């Protein structure tokens, strides 16, 4: 069995890490490079940096940040936010990123997934899917950080993403994001059962048991979290020791 991964996520605005609830109400969580360095020392397997503004000016700041992160940490990291074309991918990989996460741009232009996989390899292409459980019981995909509903449903889109060559999927439940009541394990389990690429669980981590459940019930390959790490509620080394004691294959 492949070891499960613990991945802190850093949402970046003006070079600072911020965190919100249900994708709104952001608060400052600290320096993005320093936090990344701390997580690397604590034993994080990977990091994800998301540029949540992604304006033209912010893009320059973000590329400089990616260079600093690459110079200061020794674990793989994924970057996303505002990636719309191959030129953006090229710039960020050249700045030192290991993987690229695309979300809204892939929904608008699915061939971007194939282009990234073909030019840089599937392992570089992470497709982020933000979905919300609707009143009719369906999981609907959203654009622009959870603000704009689409006509795409989660399972249909996830299967298309895999068929177009994505290396893994980062699935965030908007319904669960930031409220710390656990991951969307039922839908995670259905996703992992229907796909052949790794699924990263995101949205809902509040305590150690939530990570355990994401791996055992949700069958996720990795679990991503933000606020529990940023605000010192949970130490990654302590979390990994807990998971290991629960019989979960984890890198120490």
UniProtKB/Swiss-Prot annotation:
SUPFAM superfamilies in the cross-refs: Ribulose-phoshate binding barrel
Gene3D superfamilies: Aldolase class I (3.20.20.70)
Annotated localization: Cytoplasm
Active site (UniProt): 11, 130
Superkingdom of source: Bacteria
The name this protein goes by in its record: Imidazole glycerol phosphate synthase subunit HisF
GO annotation terms (biological process): L-histidine biosynthetic process
Classification of source organism: Bacteria, Pseudomonadati, Bacteroidota, Bacteroidia, Bacteroidales
Function (record text): IGPS catalyzes the conversion of PRFAR and glutamine to IGP, AICAR and glutamate. The HisF subunit catalyzes the cyclization activity that produces IGP and AICAR from PRFAR using the ammonia provided by the HisH subunit.
Subunit structure: Heterodimer of HisH and HisF.
GO cellular component: cytoplasm
Any Pfam family hit: His_biosynth
Catalytic activity: 5-[(5-phospho-1-deoxy-D-ribulos-1-ylimino)methylamino]-1-(5-phospho-beta-D-ribosyl)imidazole-4-carboxamide + L-glutamine = D-erythro-1-(imidazol-4-yl)glycerol 3-phosphate + 5-amino-1-(5-phospho-beta-D-ribosyl)imidazole-4-carboxamide + L-glutamate + H(+)
Membership in a protein family: Belongs to the HisA/HisF family.
Keyword Nucleus: no
Keywords for this protein: Amino-acid biosynthesis, Cytoplasm, Histidine biosynthesis, Lyase
Pathway(s): Amino-acid biosynthesis; L-histidine biosynthesis; L-histidine from 5-phospho-alpha-D-ribose 1-diphosphate: step 5/9
EC number: 4.3.2.10
